[in-house]
Amino acid sequence: MRHTLLLPTLFLPIVLSAQYGTFDKKAVATAKGTATIILQDAGDSPYNRELMNAVKANWKFTNSTDFGIITDLVSAPMDPAKTYLMKLRRSDAEKHDATFLALVQGWKMKKGETLKVENNAVTNVPEGQEIASIMVDAKLLDNGGASMLNVYVKNLQDYLKQVETGKITDKTTADRLYASRNRLVKDMALWVAKDQLDNSLADLAAIQVIYKQPVKLMDYSQLMAAAAKGQPDVALADVVITGDYKTKWCFRRVFNASTGELMYLRDEPALFEKKMGFIDKDLRILEQSR
């Protein structure tokens, strides 16, 4: 008899956390032995094309992959022998909404249980089935930002590797690992798009007053070229803003463009159009990291 994999005590709720998942090595080992179904949007989109390219080029966690459409989940039950790479959407008690690219372990669904799909994202996957997740800006992925999927796909696998090897065992060890990578950004060229800066940082000169290491300020399309290429020795800035008005929140990350490793992570409220991107404190943390 096949048993459904559930991880309720080892999974961290992630609506306001940009990168976590299961902390259970056994869950990762089980997922590694599955076939992975890559669920694309209904209809053609930049997201679909780049996700397919990213998986074909960079997905190594499982040996077998196949492609499907997210809306197939409405009528077809999940398979406990498979994992699913899909978009999820969640809301928390404070009404913060966020979209995630997630690897989900299939399970034996109960009689009458169905999955809800809204705007190409599933809204009711049990939290215990999510193996790894990364917060994404779904609109940006279809409007010039799809190349970041190359980084996100590698990032999910890096997270799984850290759990599998025991380097991540809970939220504390995950945060400690991410913080330990801050200093490594200084050994690389930090690439930031102009649109990713808060208004309090006017230009490259304002950045260089605080951050003394190699840094480039560029158009977003240039940043995406590095993401698509997986350019070595480049640290890519990434910003996701969720919510609206009183619930607006800004997540700021830095990824290794080549490996997908998360090297910096910070988030806070972005009320009254303030802190809507990288701010001086982010640069100061990176500059002072040891």
Regions found by a protein language model. Give the residues of each.
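Bacterial Sec-dependent N-terminal signal peptides
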Residues: M1-K26
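A short, well-structured beta->alpha microelement
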Residues: Q19-D24, K60-P80, T173-R176, I207-Q231
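Start-of-domain marker
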Residues: Q19-L101, K108-M109, L115
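Flexible, charged surface loops at secondary-structure boundaries
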Residues: A27-T34, P77-P80, S180-K186, A226-D233
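Structural motif
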Residues: L39-D44, K87-R89, W191-L197, T242-D244
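Short, charged N-terminal beta->alpha structural module
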Residues: A42-F61, K194-P214
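Amphipathic beta-strand/beta-sheet edge segments enriched in Tyr/Trp
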Residues: L88-K154, M218-R290
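Surface-exposed beta-loop interaction hotspot
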Residues: I134-L197
